[in-house]
Amino acid sequence: MRKLTSFACGTGAGLAAYYLQRLRDPQTAVQNSWTHSDKPVDPWALWDTNWDCREPRALVRPLRNSQPEEENRYNAELEKAKAKKARHIILVRHGEYLDVGDSDDTHHLTERGRKQAEFTGKRLCELGIKWDKVVASTMLRAQETSDIILKQIDFEKEKVVNCAFLREGAPIPPQPPVGHWKPEASQFLRDGSRIEAGFRRYFHRAYPDQEKESYTLIVGHGNVIRYFVCRALQFPAEGWLRININHASITWLTISPSGNVSIKYLGDSGFMPAELLTNRIPRDVKNVV
């Protein structure tokens, strides 16, 4: 009996010590809720349904009372404010270019960059998309890429929207920081505000009167596209530099009528020959010290 009592006391003391250690060091514990709970691990993982400020309930005057007439009014306005079709936004990065001189006017596409843009144009043509809008950054390399693509797709050049909001820049300080690229804080403030304005201009759910799915082609830049992807998917925007996309690659995002956003392609360039796959400026034509 004495041995049994000693064993029980020892077991109890051991369990108590283990439990106290768990309380002191909870971060080492693996909880079942990590994989099995309906609640997200981090509150930031919750989807913001009104991210574009067009969630129907945010646009309609709230119920003033519970009278049937008021409820009918509210439900009718709510239905009228709902989007009914999806928007597809296809983002294309410019082709490889020459980084020579201090002016954008000298940053022409390389011969390889022109071939990349041609392959992308052919790929977009093969997809058989009827484009509702084509938008291009006002920087030379994006303009040249857009011109080459337009020769392959069914869209009039005169209808292209040239947008300065899409110009390349520093959208937000990246995490983790990198040593080889450290813009001044003023550049992040200037470029970040502009690029965010570009995101808000082009990323939103469809208007309620849109009667068919729409397709918008945007020809822009690597930093801007990566930032747009993070913002659209509600990932931490500071993670944009962890993504890598090739020159003239295709990124396809879809905004559903509910406001949910999904990604179909991210930096797709598999339609190009291997010798055309690039993502950096050729060092022999790059402005380096």
UniProtKB/Swiss-Prot annotation:
UniProt-listed GO biological process terms: positive regulation of mitochondrial fission; positive regulation of mitochondrial fusion; protein dephosphorylation; response to anesthetic; response to heat
EC number: 3.1.3.16
Catalytic activity: O-phospho-L-seryl-[protein] + H2O = L-seryl-[protein] + phosphate; O-phospho-L-threonyl-[protein] + H2O = L-threonyl-[protein] + phosphate
Listed GO CC annotations: mitochondrial outer membrane
Membrane-spanning residues: 7-23
Cellular compartment(s): Mitochondrion outer membrane
Primary site of residence: mitochondrion
Family: Belongs to the phosphoglycerate mutase family. BPG-dependent PGAM subfamily.
Binding partners and assembly: Interacts with Pk92B/ASK1.
Protein name: Serine/threonine-protein phosphatase Pgam5, mitochondrial
Species in which this protein is naturally found: Drosophila simulans
The encoding gene: Pgam5
